Amino acid sequence: MKPVAARVALFDLDHTLLPIDSDHAWGVFTTTIGWTDPVGFARRNDEFYAHYKAGTLDIHDYVRFAVDAVRRQGRDAALAARERFMADVVAPALREPALALVQAHRQAGDELVIVTATNEFVTRPIATAFGVEELVAVELALGPDGWINGEIRGVPSAREGKVTRMEQWLAARNLDWEDVECTFYSDSVNDLPLLDKVAHPVATNPDDRLRALAKERGWRILDLFEKT
């Protein structure tokens, strides 16, 4: 058997390391600061979230919707709002069991990667809060002015796209799946393609469908906290 070159711990973010959905929470936050209509935006935000949970989300449509306010407000206002979002919403949602899980893999010498279907604008500072440098998130295309234009750059890291993006991540390091021993923590059946790919899938705070599947397949189940 070929020896592995590295051990890699992969973490989904929303409802896995966080008890909230950061993408949805950011949308709610934009209504509280007056960037979006609280009724119309909330309705569409909830509709997109329902599609995500059902596995029917069109991520391109969603990202256009989700980053529209950021695009319109411009860089300086968006970065200032994100800093406030981190302080008011994300920081109170950080939980010791999740921080300890990441730290345990760090102390074991594992490479740490957050792999999320939420966009990089929202998730980069969250990854930093967990002390994780490697972030595989939905990358946002930039317009001629160097600011977000509402489109996705490259392959979105959702569903099967998480496998593709991780393969790109590995290839950039001259590695393949055979070269690494991967553990992946996720709460959602949407992540089944990547859970199936890794050596050690861990159903973490799993939704009902993933919990049932994990029991059927004998996968480890980890409950870090109650979802909100």
Regions inferred by a protein language model and the residue ranges of each:
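Catalytic cores of transferase enzymes with a strong primary signal for eukaryotic protein kinases
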Residues: L13, D76-L79
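Electropositive phosphate-/nucleotide-binding environments in soluble metabolic enzymes
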Residues: I20, A42, T56, H60, ...
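Acidic/polar active-site rim loop that often engages polyanionic ligands
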Residues: D23-W26, Y62-V63, P144-E151
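A general alpha-helix detector
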Residues: A25-W26, E47, D61-F65, A81-F85
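Short, compositionally biased "basic patch" segments
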Residues: F48-R75, E139-P144
